């Protein structure tokens, strides 16, 4: 009887998931400009509209669910969650908006998060408040904060303006909650984290890896992101989102 119990115990232990296999990797992608690169600026901060559409089709055809940070807690109940983010609020993000509308069906609901620099809104190459409002109301995009002026947050003193005023301005225009901050240049320190926690529920870095929940302190304020570049092929993209 003891021998049988020991055998059953060993079988039970072998059936338990290992720590490594139990780790759930959630990709959070970062884009900037959705446009053809015309020789100005940094090439790998662009992704062509054609490539972006192919990437979204890949996600659709491979069973991914695109989420915004308002849906963070839903991720644990979804088989293949992914977050699509755009930094800086460039006007060419309207290309992503058009592609999302084109691909949206009853079975595929594309969603993305645009992190805008609130004092830059309305500049010639940036989205206007009217455009941001329209995107937010479509429920295809969540509009969140990339601060007021895009400073290195480690070197400033007026956190209230960069974090609180930026948040309030975006909320007032879009009519939707602002709960996430993208750190300019991906830079932060303990002071930045402490100030961010006063106004936001999430902080996003540019640490190049998928998110793995580890239960560490300030985990939601240290969210990593994976860059999608102009040079990213669809094969590269597949490896990126499938964590290969």
Show the residue positions of the predicted features:
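Positively charged n-region of N-terminal signal peptides that target proteins for export
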Residues: 1-4
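Bacterial N-terminal signal peptides
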Residues: 7-15
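C-terminal active-site subregion of NodB/CE4 polysaccharide deacetylases
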Residues: 22-85, 90-93, 154-244
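Acidic (Asp/Glu)-rich catalytic clusters
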Residues: 98-109, 125-144, 197, 213-217
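Substrate-binding clefts and substrate-entry loops adjacent to catalytic sites
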Residues: 144-157
């Amino acid at each position: 009887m003891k021998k049988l119990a020991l055998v059953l115990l060993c079988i039970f232990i072998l059936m338990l998931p290992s720590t490594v296999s139990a780790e759930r990797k959630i990709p959070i992608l970062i884009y900037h400009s959705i446009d053809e690169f015309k020789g100005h600026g940094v090439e790998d901060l662009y992704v062509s509209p054609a490539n972006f559409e192919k990437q979204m089709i890949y996600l659709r055809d491979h069973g991914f669910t695109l989420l915004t940070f308002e849906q963070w807690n839903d991720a644990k109940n979804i088989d293949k969650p992914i977050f699509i983010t755009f930094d800086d609020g460039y006007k060419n993000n309207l290309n992503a908006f058009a592609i999302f509308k084109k691909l949206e069906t009853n079975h595929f609901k594309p969603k993305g998060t645009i992190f805008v620099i609130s004092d830059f809104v309305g500049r010639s190459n940036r989205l206007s408040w009217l455009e941001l409002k329209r995107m937010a109301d479509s429920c295809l995009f969540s509009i969140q904060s990339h601060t007021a002026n895009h400073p290195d947050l480690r070197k400033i003193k007026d956190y209230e303006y960069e974090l609180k005023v930026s948040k309030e301005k975006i909320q007032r225009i879009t009519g939707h909650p602002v709960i996430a901050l993208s750190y300019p240049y991906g830079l932060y320190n303990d002071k930045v984290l402490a100030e961010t926690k006063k106004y936001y529920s999430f902080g996003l870095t540019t640490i190049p890896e998928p998110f793995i929940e580890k239960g560490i302190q300030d985990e939601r304020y240290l969210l990593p992101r994976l860059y999608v570049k102009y040079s990213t092929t669809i094969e590269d993209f597949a490896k990126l989102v499938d964590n290969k």
